[in-house]
């Protein structure tokens, strides 16, 4: 055990996700020896985020204002909503530059073991957005894992009754990948989702 | 890119050692969603460490006072000094409970590529400590790698002329290890350092 303040810092750092005891110690000693100005900037960055960053009241994405910059942007197509699990996923989709609609961040995926049911997600807010009739398509872009698939199925069934086009991101071989190393589920999906080679 | 504050936090976190862009993003979102009280504690821990923690004026170990708790402890044998590279190493030696002397933290190891020569280490402070004649043995416990070995050799040669017993930690097979998997240098050292099996 180190003396008071150092050990306390190691403990606090060790509570962060993906930071084990050894990393916490290394980070603590880095902080200890780092330039005080750099550490002041780090502390301010944490404080600012906690004080200023909120979640967009419409889509749930992170923002420093009432609405996020995508919901504020009049050039974004309001008739298509891409439903994702986390704010991080918004950025991932944005990087593709192939989606010009709006988003809806659920805040997670259905995961009964972790106690996350549909009520814990921002599904009610999604239904509210559908009320004005402007939305024509919902693209479900949850993670292609157990929880994401369960959430997608739940949403698809629920939205079917409303009569809106509901689509799901294609599953298949990753571009640049190797067919030989694809797992059987992915390869199976690639077969199911095969497309006309001439189109 | 995220909006201002979030991206700034990701950038600051990404500057920490061992934190890549993905980890920085994950940490930033954890901080964003975490309990404000927890984050306040983290910020306070960083601030406190930067404000309060100093280096012991005698041995260079981390401390919140003028002298570290080992240098302050009258039960520690003042005639033996264990020379280590970092404060972390003090803790590692302390955990063995087999050393009851004092320490001297060099603050690194000789590494010409990184621009660290003997002048950048706390070697002058070590020589000052030897002046009072109370010290009878110096145990060099630098890391068993290239830089640590170079530092050990440098110190051993320098201290030889002063006429103090200078020892180096034994190299050999790690306890609980497997002879078959030991690298040839370690195994070679284990042969060189072999001891009478009956002693």
Swiss-Prot record, chains A, B:
A zinc finger (C4-type) spans 56-71. Pfam families: RecR_C (PF21175), RecR_HhH (PF21176), RecR_ZnF (PF02132), Toprim_4 (PF13662). PROSITE patterns: RECR, TOPRIM. Keywords: DNA damage, DNA recombination, DNA repair, Metal-binding, Zinc, Zinc-finger. It comes from the Bacteria. GO terms for molecular function: DNA binding; zinc ion binding. One of its GO terms (biological process) is DNA recombination. InterPro entries: DNA_Rcmb_RecR, Rcmb_RecR, Rcmb_RecR_Znf, TOPRIM_dom, TOPRIM_RecR. The keyword Zinc-finger applies. Residues 79-174 form the Toprim domain. The keyword DNA damage applies. NCBIfam families: recR. May play a role in DNA repair. It seems to be involved in an RecBC-independent recombinational process of DNA repair. It may act with RecF and RecO. Belongs to the RecR family. This is Recombination protein RecR.
